[in-house]
Every structure is written in structure tokens, then in C-alpha cells.
A protein has these predicted regions:
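Accessory, non-ATPase domains that flank or precede helicase/AAA+ motor cores in DNA-metabolism machines
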Residues: 1-199
Length: 199
């Protein structure tokens, strides 16, 4: 609430769900989100290898790194490799996308790499799926979320890294209701959690 000068209650409302969700057992639903070993090999080119090595060398504490490259240049694969570093060590990851329309295409690439469904969070996600994702994130049973701005407010149990894809996109700005820039708030959250954020 200090970040965007709104009452604390309004900020908390963005993070909380009905108490019935907290008490429900969704264990069977979480299986589809478990990362599996993909049968497909994903090889990086020289530039991608150099970018990944650079990001890894910066470390796992709070830092802001911008990965430059036009759309389709291979940034996503670098993101995925970096996310896997954290998932293999028991951490969770958040991938922010500027547009809901991008999630389907991104999700297909995600399935190829991680061998599992992704937990997708945006305004079009059903109430039931939101309940499952919220509980899974809170309990540490869902490792990765792909989402729009509002996914920033999910109660991650052990968040290890945040990725902001297309960080320059104007869609990250919200002017209605609580006004904020999701990219800037993602950087703030990474700072608070002392974790890296890649833009």
C-alpha cells in the first residue's frame, strides 16, 4: 500500500481468496503442474549460452538483469533454462506476460520444455482454477506460474526468480482501481524477497 499510496485493505484484497479455498484439498489437481523431464533436447546457440552464463554469474540474490533481443530471438529459452536452475533446487518461479493473448503460445513452448502444464493466472482464469493455483502456490506444490499483472500478488511459499517478458510493454501499467506498473512492482517484490529478476 505504501508503494501506490492506497489503503492497506485494498492491497490485501488483491492477495486473498475466500477462506474455503484455504481449507480445501486440491492435491490431485497439483500433479499436472509437476515439472517432468522433457524427451526433447533444447540446445542454446552461442549468444544464448553467453547470456545464460552471464545471468548465472551475477548470482541468485537480488539483481535486475535486462535480456536484450527482438521478439523471436530466443530469449524465452534462456528464461526457461534459468528458471530450471531454481526449480531443480526447490524454488518457485513467476513469469509475467503483458497480454493474456500471449499465454497460449507461451504455454505451448512451456509444455515442450518442462513437460507439464503451466499454472496460468489472469482475469480469464476460471474461479476453480484460481482456487487451485492460489492454494498450490501457497503450499509450494505448484512450481511455476505464468500470469498477467495480478499474478504478482500470489502468495508464493518459496519464490526464487521473477521473469518479466517484454518489460517495455504498456500493458504492464494499470490505471483503473489500484494504479501500478507491474514491471516496477515486480522489481520491488524481487528486492523484498532478495531474489533475481530478469527483464
Amino acid at each position: 500500500s505504501k508503494y501506490n499510496l492506497v489503503p492497506l485493505g485494498m492491497s490485501l484484497k488483491m492477495c486473498l481468496l475466500n477462506k474455503d479455498v484455504v481449507e480445501k484439498n486440491f492435491d490431485k489437481e497439483f500433479d499436472k503442474f509437476k515439472v517432468k523431464k522433457s524427451s526433447k533436447k533444447f540446445l542454446l546457440n552461442k549468444e544464448q549460452e553467453e547470456s545464460l552464463a552471464y545471468i548465472r554469474n551475477i548470482g541468485n540474490n537480488y539483481n535486475v538483469t535486462v535480456l536484450e533481443g527482438v521478439t523471436g530471438s530466443g530469449k524465452t529459452l534462456v528464461y526457461f533454462k534459468r528458471i530450471k536452475d531454481f526449480i531443480d533446487r526447490g524454488f518457485q518461479a513467476l513469469i509475467l506476460l503483458p497480454e493474456i493473448a500471449l499465454t497460449n503460445q507461451f504455454n505451448e513452448r512451456f509444455k515442450e520444455f518442462f513437460g507439464s502444464e503451466s499454472a496460468v493466472w489472469h482475469s480469464g482464469t476460471s474461479k476453480k482454477n484460481k482456487s487451485i493455483i492460489w492454494k498450490g502456490i501457497k503450499d509450494g506444490k505448484i512450481p511455476i506460474v505464468i500470469g498477467a499483472r495480478s499474478s504478482l500478488f500470489l502468495p508464493f511459499k518459496n519464490l526464487g526468480i521473477i521473469i518479466v517478458d517484454e518489460e517495455h510493454d504498456a500493458s504492464y501499467k494499470q490505471d483503473e482501481g489500484i494504479s501500478y506498473n507491474a514491471r516496477d512492482m515486480a522489481i520491488t517484490r524481487a528486492s523484498i524477497e532478495n531474489i533475481p529478476i530478469n527483464l
